[in-house]
Amino acid sequence: MRTNPTTSRPGVSTSEEKSTGRIDQIIGPVLDVTFPPGKLPYIYNALVVQSRDTADKQINVTCEVQQLLGNNRVRAVAMSATDGLMRGMEVIDTGAPLSVPVGGATLGRIFNVLGEPVDNLGPVDSSATFPIHRSAPAFIELDTKLSIFETGIKVVDLLAPYRRGGKIGLFGGAGVGKTVLIMELINNIAKAHGGVSVFGGVGERTREGNDLYMEMKESGVINEKNIEESKVALVYGQMNEPPGARMRVGLTALTMAEYFRDVNKQDVLLFIDNIFRFVQAGSEVSALLGRMPSAVGYQPTLSTEMGSLQERIASTKKGSITSIQAVYVPADDLTDPAPATTFAHLDATTVLSRGLASKGIYPAVDPLDSTSTMLQPRIVGNEHYETAQRVKETLQRYKELQDIIAILGLDELSEEDRLTVARARKIERFLSQPFFVAEVFTGSPGKYVALAETIRGFQLILSGELDGLPEQAFYLVGNIDEASTKAITLEEENKSQK
């Protein structure tokens, strides 16, 4: 196999003398192209078809070389619709892989898989481009220190902390606050870490992508008046795109994130929604290329494809890429090869609960189902670990007692269990938090809570020092001092009403 030399040299796209071939065969989004002897393109090279169709409309299709078939023929996958293409049309080898714009000029903009802006705001003013196929950072460049990535969100930082440069799976259905949580994380990384975010919509519904863009503009994550002050770049490959585009859009987003990490030396947050669609697109392409399917009809190269994407998401000595990936689980089967392969790469899982959302507790992160490999005494320290374990024990006991409470009522519980229930309800409410990006909807100012403050707050609840405060005082507040202040306000309101 001829591999592309540009993929091993980050940021370099050396273009040789461009050779031209002819389309030999078209099967859906897959093209077979014949080149002159000795002029074959490398694997992953971008090919361009520029012509006119029978209605004299301009055709501009970019493809990526996937296989060398022999007899001077290559098989390529199109990144856009192949409508209007015909056998015999001229195909130009660009001599390099797909390259996309990178840097500060990408912030606040929406791109497609080719790095072309699709937001009708004109061309991108960026001279720097990176090829989307790049090697993972060398082992000696990696930052192997285990450090917590503080998000300022109490429930995440205490019970399922994120690893700096780690990978987090975000599990949640429709309407439980996934988008708001994503936007808050984008906002907090910009304010607390001076970082930026890249959002990769892989197999997204176009409507959802549009809604996210509009909500980001409303909340100030994207600054319309001064686009350079935006905190996020968006890359979309929607559901209606050919499988080639959906398979590569994740790499486009990752390439933009790598520039911020390696060149700007920033902490970057990379969102991929949905990582399952990346696998699904790879499965479609694999079948189109004639590969024998593997387990459950997935591509035989499933682990390799997932690994090549995930290994590039890492912390180096220059900066970090922390990735949050929405994971769709087909038919709720966690043993399905797609989610099972993803789980092998995750450091933490954040599970959003419809039950908590229906109670009005936001963020609706399930404190018992969410997990993290970082929650170990040697990493987070004994104080943090013990507080988190006691919080989980209290909530678990409350969960066990709920059936008894529903049938017999609170009065039938022992004194100790009644105290556990009261504290668990306070903990549940204290895990809620007003978000900066939701200020326009709630009217409450957003709160960023430092990890030390979070631990102190839960320790005070568990110790019983705050047993006298009403549970409403803990709902939608930042640190524990605000809960005490809110309790005094509630008491004064009750007195004035009497």
Swiss-Prot record:
Gene3D superfamilies: 2.40.10.170, Bovine Mitochondrial F1-atpase, Atp Synthase Beta Chain, Chain D, domain 3, P-loop containing nucleotide triphosphate hydrolases. PROSITE patterns: ATPASE_ALPHA_BETA. ATP binds at residues 172-179. One of its GO terms (molecular function) is ATP hydrolysis activity. Keywords: ATP synthesis, ATP-binding, CF(1), Chloroplast, Hydrogen ion transport, Ion transport, Membrane, Nucleotide-binding, Plastid, Thylakoid, Translocase, Transport. GO terms for cellular component: chloroplast thylakoid membrane; mitochondrion; proton-transporting ATP synthase complex. Its EC number is 7.1.2.2. Residues 1-20 are annotated as: Disordered. It comes from the Eukaryota. It catalyses: ATP + H2O + 4 H(+)(in) = ADP + phosphate + 5 H(+)(out). The keyword Translocase applies. Its main location: plastid. Belongs to the ATPase alpha/beta chains family. This is ATP synthase subunit beta, chloroplastic. It comes from Hordeum vulgare (Barley).
